[in-house]
Amino acid sequence: MTSVAQRQAQPAQPSTSQTAAPTRTQTETSSPAILRLRGAHSNGRSVQWRSDVVDNEGLGRKKSKVCCIYHRPKGVDESSDDSSSSSDSSSSSDSDSDPEPDQDKRITSGGGSSGRGHRHSHDHDHDGREGGCNHDHGRGRKHGNKGKKTERRPSPNAYEKMPKYKPKDGGAGPSNSETQGPGGSK
């Protein structure tokens, strides 16, 4: 215990430490920067729709996406650009009413007759004279006006077809409770 008493008897030496903090004074000599924006505020939307653009979704609004814009197809008597038509594409809906130009593509690119769309024809008289027959021998498309070549109206693509909507009943549609009956289950 003497060691504890000796420690208590010794006077504690004060520890000295100094912290010096430099002080700075800043004087602002420049004026505050002012940012000025130029240009008028836009009034409304920047998209201007043509008068022939139709609301294709039936939601009361028009959008700028391609799938939501419907342009009415032009009539036969109206002029149209050849570059905007899709007659060069080879889809099955276009080939249903096409006159015979696709046959040449099929023969040269197909290399053989697959039976689908193949047209079998003969070089004999089809007007009923000299024992000729009055019907088509082919399994392909039949055309009544072989002498006349009429230009067909281009069929609309998926972006040009107007969707058919079911009429709304005034509500949000039939609920499960209406279709299930009074018991609540079928």
Swiss-Prot record:
Residues 1-186 are annotated as: Disordered. GO terms for cellular component: nucleus. Residues 122-137 have a biased composition (Basic and acidic residues). Its main location: nucleus. It is found in: Nucleus. Residues 1-32 have a biased composition (Polar residues). Keywords: Nucleus. Residues 82-94 have a biased composition (Low complexity). One of its GO terms (molecular function) is protein serine/threonine phosphatase inhibitor activity. Residues 138-151 have a biased composition (Basic residues). PANTHER family: E3 UBIQUITIN-PROTEIN LIGASE PPP1R11, E3 UBIQUITIN-PROTEIN LIGASE PPP1R11-RELATED. Regulator of type 1 phosphatases which maintains protein phosphatase activity under strict control. Belongs to the YPI1 family. This is Type 1 phosphatases regulator ypi-1. It comes from Neurospora crassa (strain ATCC 24698 / 74-OR23-1A / CBS 708.71 / DSM 1257 / FGSC 987). The gene is ypi-1.
